A protein has these predicted regions:
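Active-site cofactor/cluster-binding pocket
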Residues: 1-159
Length: 159
């Protein structure tokens, strides 16, 4: 990542899938790495089952929380039916991380699927693994640390 470049990430899925939790973890990890971070949320029908997306932007200096349409470097999608709904956010050459990027059957806690996708995302970002782990621990109560750290490791290793 160039020093002045802003990294644009859109996390999308359905209400109840941890989209906002995932984008919060990305934001926290980037902040812990020393970047200026902006985040915005589009809840839509954010009750369980409705479309939800959240933009995360980080870099040396970020002015707007919104990822301009067609400029997302990364599109992380938790629900398969949300891929086409959100594909227009991705820039040409951007990276789509969809639900098929992780084998959910290998997770001990299926609710940690969103964090497993962050593990995949982490392979593409120049953020130290330690800031990710700190952000994950900060996002969940202690009793959920092991399951979420395991999910992150699964995605990060690409298993």
């Amino acid at each position: 990542m160039s020093e002045d470049r802003v990294t644009n990430i859109v996390v999308a899925g359905l209400g109840g899938q941890g989209v906002l939790k995932a984008s919060g973890i990305v934001s926290d990890a980037a902040f812990r790495a020393g970047f200026d971070v902006k985040q915005s949320e589009l809840h839509g029908m954010s009750q369980r089952g409705g479309s939800v997306s959240s933009d995360v932007r980080f870099g040396r200096e970020v002015f707007s929380p919104m990822v301009p349409t067609g400029e997302a470097d990364f599109l992380v999608v938790v629900a398969p039916d949300q891929i086409e709904v959100n594909r227009h956010q991705l820039r040409t050459g951007g990276v789509l991380i969809g639900p098929d990027a992780v084998d959910g059957k290998k997770l001990t806690n299926k609710k940690s699927f969103n964090v497993a996708l962050l593990g995949v995302l982490s392979r593409h970002l120049d953020l130290a693994e330690t800031v990710w782990l700190e952000a994950i621990r900060a996002a969940f109560p202690e009793k959920l640390h092991a399951a979420n750290l395991e999910a992150f490791a699964l995605g990060r290793k690409g298993v």
